Swiss-Prot record:
Homohexamer. It comes from Thermoanaerobacter pseudethanolicus (strain ATCC 33223 / 39E). Pfam families: Hfq. Signal peptide: none annotated. This is RNA-binding protein Hfq. Belongs to the Hfq family.
Length: 86
């Protein structure tokens, strides 16, 4: 079994890529709401989304069903060690 330091966290890699590349996303919540915008930051429990009208939204990950990027995201395991916020 891999150690926790060597484990690849696909969720963090995905969120970091869409954040760094300013890829617009649609966040589908478990209650059916859709939120569109840019990922500005994230941690273990939350995602900060900047909506199209520049409003910042703090979304708890347990409320998220799906995140759909507007364009394909290239995954790179080396991105997991980069910092999460600019």
């Amino acid at each position: 079994m891999a150690s926790s330091k060597a484990a690849i966290n696909l969720q963090d890699i995905f969120l970091n890529q869409v954040r760094k590349e300013h890829v617009p996303v649609t966040v589908y919540l478990i209650n059916g709401f859709q939120l569109k915008g840019l990922v500005k930051g994230f941690d273990n429990f939350t995602v900060v989304l900047e909506s199209e009208n520049k409003q910042q939204l703090l979304i708890y990950k347990h409320a998220i069903s799906t995140i759909t990027p507007q364009k394909p995201v290239i995954f790179s395991a080396s991105d997991k060690d980069e910092k999460r916020e600019e």
